[in-house]
Amino acid sequence: MKTKLSMVAAALLLSVVATGTCHAQQTPLAVKIPFAFQAGDHTLPAGEYRVESTITGSGTIQRLSQANGEAVMFLVTMPVESRYGHANPELVFNCYGQTKFLSQIWTGDREGRQLYKSDREKQISVGERGREFALVLHPTDVKQ
């Protein structure tokens, strides 16, 4: 009886994990970013990038890579919700002077991903008030 109960519990857990993983997988976004920016602790040049979600046991990691395959990085994120939703995918940047930090990734629905602030962004933001802007990706800009 105890063995059957353990097997049922394991099967239930596996189905929940598999369902969550399948549900959370998203189509990768390919986007052209027209300016240099910071992502995590790295400075990246303007160019074409691909953003993909990778599901882990502790949360979602965003995989950011250049279209030419040169730079690949993994960014730890947390969920962020919008009351209004985002009709189109968009990337949100925090701007301090000429320095732009990738802050949020929205795939065109009510739930997006918030990046944790890097040490550099925390340091810059102490003495300077930043502004936020979104790079809205229209359906013609999004390559899937």
What is each stretch, according to the model?
Residues 26-42:
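Short N-terminal segments immediately surrounding and downstream of signal-peptide cleavage
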